[in-house]
């Protein structure tokens, strides 16, 4: 299965596509980030995210896309900006005819690190280890996107095994 993870951010929106082979080994297909300039108007930032995510989806053909659930931020303005980015990311996914799976941040960290309150550096290190990457993914948004994809792969594999036993 090939899964794209997206980590929505107002400065960087990370993306990563991870594939699980028939032996459940994980492989990083592509990873990167859409860098957004603080000087650009919001509508230009959102258009850039939309275009670049659509391009990655069309080029690498994931079967499903996973995104983190909305979390509650202390700063309402920041939460609103992230909501815009998340909405545009979901629109890009829908435009490409794919479905979106969502996961709570605690679930992502638990699936990748084994601890729901893991630090960013722990997530980055574990993502690099699980994907056999030569270095830790940077910026952290890229590692987070890969972690979201890994979370979906682990979760769907567990659900498949559970249904097979039933």
Swiss-Prot record:
GO terms for molecular function: crossover junction DNA endonuclease activity; DNA binding; magnesium ion binding. It catalyses: Endonucleolytic cleavage at a junction such as a reciprocal single-stranded crossover between two homologous DNA duplexes (Holliday junction). Mg(2+) 2 binds at residue 68. It is an enzyme of class 3 (hydrolase). Pfam families: RuvC. Mg(2+) 1 binds at residues 7, 141. The keyword Transmembrane helix does not apply. Belongs to the RuvC family. Homodimer which binds Holliday junction (HJ) DNA. The HJ becomes 2-fold symmetrical on binding to RuvC with unstacked arms; it has a different conformation from HJ DNA in complex with RuvA. In the full resolvosome a probable DNA-RuvA(4)-RuvB(12)-RuvC(2) complex forms which resolves the HJ. GO terms for cellular component: cytoplasm; Holliday junction resolvase complex. This is Crossover junction endodeoxyribonuclease RuvC. Keywords: Cytoplasm, DNA damage, DNA recombination, DNA repair, DNA-binding, Endonuclease, Hydrolase, Magnesium, Metal-binding, Nuclease. It is found in: Cytoplasm. It comes from Koribacter versatilis (strain Ellin345).
């Amino acid at each position: 299965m090939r899964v794209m993870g997206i980590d929505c951010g107002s400065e960087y929106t990370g993306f990563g596509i991870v594939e699980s082979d028939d032996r459940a080994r994980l492989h990083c297909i592509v990873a990167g980030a859409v860098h957004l300039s603080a000087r650009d108007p919001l509508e230009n930032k959102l258009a850039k995210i939309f275009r670049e995510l659509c391009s990655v989806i069309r080029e690498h053909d994931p079967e499903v896309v996973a995104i983190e659930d909305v979390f509650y931020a202390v700063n309402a303005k920041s939460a609103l900006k992230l909501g815009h980015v998340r909405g545009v990311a979901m629109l890009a996914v829908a435009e490409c005819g794919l479905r979106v799976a969502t996961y709570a941040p605690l679930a992502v960290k638990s699936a990748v690190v084994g601890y729901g309150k893991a630090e960013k550096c722990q997530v980055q290190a574990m993502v690099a280890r699980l994907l056999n990457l030569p270095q830790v993914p940077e910026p952290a948004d890229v590692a987070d996107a890969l972690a979201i994809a890994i979370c979906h792969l682990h979760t769907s594999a567990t659900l498949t095994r559970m249904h097979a036993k039933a």
